[in-house]
Regions:
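ABC ATP-binding cassette signature C-motif
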Residues: 1-163
């Protein structure tokens, strides 16, 4: 679902309430894992290294740590060996975004909620993100004002919010 509308209408507020399960009149079914990408990266712990952040998610989801899988997935998001041991707080905004996306893939959510996922991402990295989202097989709610990005992703439904 592509959610669109003018700035200030409450798209981010709606997404957050859906992700937190506090939206009036909407309930996510019990047992559905929700992945939430916030444009302010507040889902990341800036004190963790990239490795620690990815490892925590992997251990939470699978109960084990598969270093080879984690590194392979990280590489798909341009997270290289020199970045993996860096504290998240020391990364550029674009690198934080790539870490947030790698975490989402590791989480294997049934519902993916994305609030302006192209913000802070280097334009050269957008195809990497678009490809990952296009291959995603669960439900997705996306807010993005970047039409060139959205065109690269399979969108089944569109909802325009207006006052």
């Amino acid at each position: 679902l592509l959610l669109s509308g003018p700035n200030g209408i409450g798209k981010s507020t709606l997404l957050e309430s859906l992700a937190k399960g506090t939206a009036k009149g909407a309930k996510i079914m019990e047992g559905i894992r929700v992945g939430y990408y916030r444009q302010d990266f507040s889902t990341l712990n800036f004190e963790d290294s990239v490795r620690e952040s990815l490892t925590k998610v992997l251990k939470e989801v699978t109960g084990k740590i598969d270093e080879e899988y984690m590194r392979s997935l990280a590489a798909n998001f341009l997270i290289t060996g020199d970045i993996i041991n860096t504290k998240i707080g020391d990364l550029s905004e674009g690198q934080k975004g790539l870490v947030a996306f790698a975490r989402l893939v590791l989480e294997r959510p049934g519902l993916l909620i994305l609030d302006e996922p192209t913000n802070h991402i280097n334009f050269r990295h957008l195809p990497v993100i678009a490809r990952a989202l296009d291959q995603y097989e669960g439900a997705m709610i996306l807010v993005s004002h970047v039409s060139e990005f959205v065109e690269q992703i399979r969108i089944d439904e569109r909802l325009e919010l207006d006052k």
